[in-house]
């Protein structure tokens, strides 16, 4: 086992704080409307230019192991805030730095670290309650666009396209961000349920211009097994032909004689049919078929529930206003399923989302909710260069997460004002002893740090601005982009409550751990072994005399 280097007390804490400062100073340069860019070296290709706090934090590794431990712990604040709320990483880092710096000074002055931590925790709990108190729900598309704009570093086009996407697919809908091929941002919306399976034969195509199979007011047959024998399908086909409607078949597989017969019937115009494979695999496939059944008011033909294909009737089939099938995708639009059943199914899936611990499962479940509840929107980010594309895509991702957080928990005045208002509400807060009171004061001072940094990055004097903001009430604050004082809600400067809350709670959590650290253990650096002698025959081996055996 390698030897360890151990540091205690003030020596350990001071090194840790140095690491925190290095990381935080790099990250906080990006805060606010006039925040600066950070250039990140890449092992190959052009460097990345970003204003995204978590992207900067992830790149930082320090040579000194003890300083690096401090930096990595603050990196955890940024990552956790990003996971919780999708934005607010820079705010969380600034708060953590302020709490840790002041806390370490207090411990060095002889105060009890545990009491300081309790004081900080008490202040943060009260501040979170006050944030929830001043939070307002996002009432309209305009508020959503404003939140997106602020999160995307005051880019109004990004805020607007996210608001448009939410308007199209609903607040439960899935919105994904992709790299576009043009210079402008584009929004593609797929309403209804889309899954990534296309037609099994190009002979099903009936729209030559778009190369799709379009079915108006079709019946929909859902089956969880392979269909290879056409005799099994005859009762359903006869019923559909009598009704004079087209038919979509979604099954594990349609092959051989069955597929050939369907193609012939379609070509001859006897009955218009399109067959596609069911999406997913195993249990996920069954669940998605059930989703389709609920959406279309049909039943999954499955032996598990005592239904066989040859006994299926037209009553077991689902219905929809329109179905469009391309080479890669099938879209079911306006299924006729009972809305109460759809809502119940959505609620059931949401419960599964809360219970799962797997990020992959959670993402797939959220996709299912979106497909049932609204649809899918794709924002295609446009830019003139690849470097700009990556930077812009990061900002769109941040803005999208921020707007989702705003819909979830509401909004508070932005620009660091909400935390300053929370300070005034906690004026009379007291701890059990003087050290706890000092911990409360540390937290209250730290809550000014985001506003202080926004103002400093804008090139103004923080103390003057903070005093003026404190003199005001409600959403009165400072617009760093224009240099004006006024109502932040009128300016459209809003932060999601969830983002501000998560940033404060996560910063306090890590700061509490670092303040109460008394020892640090790292691997001792290895001594460089002397170089071997030159290779001039055996005489060169004399260089080995300096080696330890």
Swiss-Prot record:
<feature type="binding site">
    <location>
        <begin position="30"/>
        <end position="33"/>
    </location>
    <ligand>
        <name>ATP</name>
    </ligand>
</feature>
<dbReference type="InterPro" id="IPR027409">
    <property type="entry name" value="GroEL-like_apical_dom_sf"/>
</dbReference>
<comment type="similarity">
    <text>Belongs to the chaperonin (HSP60) family.</text>
</comment>
<keyword id="KW-0413">Isomerase</keyword>
<protein>
    <recommendedName>
        <fullName>Chaperonin GroEL</fullName>
        <ecNumber>5.6.1.7</ecNumber>
    </recommendedName>
</protein>
<dbReference type="InterPro" id="IPR001844">
    <property type="entry name" value="Cpn60/GroEL"/>
</dbReference>
<dbReference type="InterPro" id="IPR027410">
    <property type="entry name" value="TCP-1-like_intermed_sf"/>
</dbReference>
<dbReference type="GO" id="GO:0042026">
    <property type="term" value="P:protein refolding"/>
</dbReference>
<feature type="binding site">
    <location>
        <position position="495"/>
    </location>
    <ligand>
        <name>ATP</name>
    </ligand>
</feature>
<dbReference type="GO" id="GO:0016853">
    <property type="term" value="F:isomerase activity"/>
</dbReference>
<dbReference type="GO" id="GO:0005524">
    <property type="term" value="F:ATP binding"/>
</dbReference>
<dbReference type="GO" id="GO:0140662">
    <property type="term" value="F:ATP-dependent protein folding chaperone"/>
</dbReference>
<keyword id="KW-0067">ATP-binding</keyword>
<keyword id="KW-0547">Nucleotide-binding</keyword>
<dbReference type="InterPro" id="IPR002423">
    <property type="entry name" value="Cpn60/GroEL/TCP-1"/>
</dbReference>
<dbReference type="InterPro" id="IPR018370">
    <property type="entry name" value="Chaperonin_Cpn60_CS"/>
</dbReference>
<keyword id="KW-0143">Chaperone</keyword>
<feature type="binding site">
    <location>
        <position position="415"/>
    </location>
    <ligand>
        <name>ATP</name>
    </ligand>
</feature>
<dbReference type="InterPro" id="IPR027413">
    <property type="entry name" value="GROEL-like_equatorial_sf"/>
</dbReference>
<dbReference type="GO" id="GO:0005737">
    <property type="term" value="C:cytoplasm"/>
</dbReference>
<feature type="binding site">
    <location>
        <begin position="87"/>
        <end position="91"/>
    </location>
    <ligand>
        <name>ATP</name>
    </ligand>
</feature>
<comment type="function">
    <text>Together with its co-chaperonin GroES, plays an essential role in assisting protein folding. The GroEL-GroES system forms a nano-cage that allows encapsulation of the non-native substrate proteins and provides a physical environment optimized to promote and accelerate protein folding.</text>
</comment>
<dbReference type="GO" id="GO:0051082">
    <property type="term" value="F:unfolded protein binding"/>
</dbReference>
<comment type="subunit">
    <text>Forms a cylinder of 14 subunits composed of two heptameric rings stacked back-to-back. Interacts with the co-chaperonin GroES.</text>
</comment>
<feature type="binding site">
    <location>
        <position position="51"/>
    </location>
    <ligand>
        <name>ATP</name>
    </ligand>
</feature>
<dbReference type="Pfam" id="PF00118">
    <property type="entry name" value="Cpn60_TCP1"/>
</dbReference>
<keyword id="KW-0963">Cytoplasm</keyword>
<feature type="binding site">
    <location>
        <begin position="479"/>
        <end position="481"/>
    </location>
    <ligand>
        <name>ATP</name>
    </ligand>
</feature>
């Amino acid at each position: 086992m390698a030897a360890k280097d151990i540091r205690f007390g003030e020596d350990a804490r001071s090194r840790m704080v140095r690491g925190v400062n290095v990381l935080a100073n790099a990250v906080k340069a990006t805060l606010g409307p006039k925040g600066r860019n950070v250039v990140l070296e890449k092992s190959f290709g052009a460097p990345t230019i970003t204003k995204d706090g978590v992207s900067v934090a992830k790149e930082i590794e320090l040579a000194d192991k003890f300083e690096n431990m401090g930096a990595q712990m603050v990196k955890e604040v940024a990552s956790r805030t990003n996971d919780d709320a999708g934005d607010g990483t820079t705010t969380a880092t600034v708060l953590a730095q302020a709490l840790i710096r002041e806390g370490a000074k207090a411990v060095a002055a002889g105060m009890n670290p545990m009491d300081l931590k309790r004081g900080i925790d008490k202040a943060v709990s009260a501040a979170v309650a006050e944030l929830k108190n001043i939070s307002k729900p996002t009432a309209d598309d305009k508020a959503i666009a404003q939140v997106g704009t602020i999160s995307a570093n005051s880019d109004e086009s990004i805020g607007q396209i996210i608001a448009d996407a939410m308007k199209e697919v609903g607040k439960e809908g899935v919105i994904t961000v992709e790299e576009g091929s043009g210079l402008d941002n584009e929004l593609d919306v797929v309403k209804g349920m889309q899954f990534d399976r296309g037609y099994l034969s190009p002979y099903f195509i009936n729209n030559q211009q778009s190369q799709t199979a379009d079915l108006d007011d079709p019946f929909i047959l859902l089956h969880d097994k392979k269909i290879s024998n056409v005799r099994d399908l005859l009762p359903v086909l006869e019923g559909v032909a009598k009704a004079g409607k087209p038919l979509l078949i979604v099954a594990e597989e349609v092959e051989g004689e069955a597929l050939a017969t369907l193609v012939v019937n379609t070509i001859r115009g006897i009955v218009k049919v399109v067959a596609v494979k069911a999406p997913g695999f195993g249990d996920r496939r069954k669940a998605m078929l059930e989703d389709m059944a609920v959406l279309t008011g049909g039943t999954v033909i499955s032996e598990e529930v005592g239904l066989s294909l040859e006994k299926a009737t037209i009553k077991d089939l689902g219905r929809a206003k329109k179905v469009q099938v391309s080479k890669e995708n099938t879209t079911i639009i306006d299924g006729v399923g009972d809305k109460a059943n759809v809502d119940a199914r959505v609620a059931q899936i949401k419960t599964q989302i809360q219970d799962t611990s797997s990020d992959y499962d959670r993402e797939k479940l959220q996709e299912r909710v979106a497909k049932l509840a609204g649809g899918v929107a794709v924002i295609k980010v446009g830019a003139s260069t690849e470097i700009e594309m990556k930077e812009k895509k990061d900002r769109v991702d941040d803005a999208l997460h921020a707007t989702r957080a705003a819909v979830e928990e509401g909004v508070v005045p932005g620009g660091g004002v909400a935390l300053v208002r929370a300070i005034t509400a906690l004026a009379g807060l007291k701890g059990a002893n003087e050290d706890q009171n000092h911990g409360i004061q540390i937290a209250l001072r730290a809550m000014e740090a985001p506003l202080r940094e926004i103002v400093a990055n804008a090139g103004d004097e923080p103390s003057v601005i903070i005093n003026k903001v404190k003199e005001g009430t409600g959403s009165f604050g400072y617009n760093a982009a224009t240099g004006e004082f006024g109502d932040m809600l009128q300016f459209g400067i809003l932060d999601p409550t969830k983002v501000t809350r998560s940033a404060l709670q996560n910063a306090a959590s890590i700061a509490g751990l670092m303040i109460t650290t008394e020892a640090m253990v790292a691997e001792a650096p290895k001594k460089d072994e002397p170089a071997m002698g030159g290779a001039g025959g055996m005489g060169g081996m004399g260089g080995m005399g300096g080696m330890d055996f």
